[in-house]
């Protein structure tokens, strides 16, 4: 089984060797689970039990799944993950730090697993970083080759590098590109985290902040100006708000709004520099961009990103930059 744990939901799937999902379950994560590792582990365990029950019901296997003597569960989470120890070192999205999540989930399932017919081989729970799972799935069944740079751009920005089909782990810290400091395009001389400038939610917030600031100036408001350093936390925006705000931002660009264009272009500039530096370090490997917020029209996002990257790499071979084929399902399928 693969399980993806986000701030909003737990998604669990069973997939076959071709990556096709056989059965799936999705459960919302209550707000009180944030920063409560034991409660979160219970929610993950509940999703796993529901998926197993659903699978056996679908196949009419009331006595258990024949031939299945062990259950192996891969769990993906955002943040810094020590995969060898099964520990979340730090996850802002989940509010966890130094949390042995794999062990907690295993404990939440131990009594249930002992009663599952035929499960003599026991239960194994493994923990993975979400972008690494997405990269591996895209390499196996999606748009990437065995060597790739996987870039997830949504509420946050994270990445993973696969070399020879194997994720580069970096003691759990590999892929935390969203935390890199870049020049803040909204405040001269200041710096901000990449994901507070160039994630989709950050660009929505920057555009909204610009409109509010213009409104305050127009009406002589004494409201406080936003602080430099980008968005305090791009993930404060919910996914529906980001999606709605993205439509507004793209609509403003199409209507000729210069501020909206500046926000979009400066975000793409930062992403292009990241990709170009990756190419300089690793060579022209596949670059796969996965974003639930990416508009269907590649002309707004991927095409200008490709042009910027091609310009920045100079006389180096430009990478093959493509949209993820598996979309939002890549992470849980990889797990």
Predicted segments, located by residue:
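Internal alpha/beta domain cores that form substrate/cofactor-binding pockets in large enzymes
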Residues: 261-282, 287-335
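Glycine-rich phosphate-binding loop of actin/hexokinase-like ATP-binding domains
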Residues: 145-201
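Short glycine-aspartate micro-motif
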Residues: 1-4, 70-74, 147-152, 158
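A mobile "lid/hinge" subdomain adjacent to the ATP/sugar-phosphate binding pocket shared
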Residues: 187, 191-288, 294
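Glycine-rich beta-strand-to-loop/alpha-helix junction loops that act as flexible
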Residues: 71-79, 153, 285-296
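Short glycine-rich, Thr/Ser-proximal phosphate-binding strand/loop in the N-terminal lobe
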Residues: 3-46, 87-90, 171-174, 178-185
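Short, acidic, Ser/Thr-enriched surface-loop or helix-capping motifs
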Residues: 16, 83, 162
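Glycine-rich phosphate-binding loop and adjoining helix at the ATP-binding site
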Residues: 32-45, 49, 53, 66-73, ...
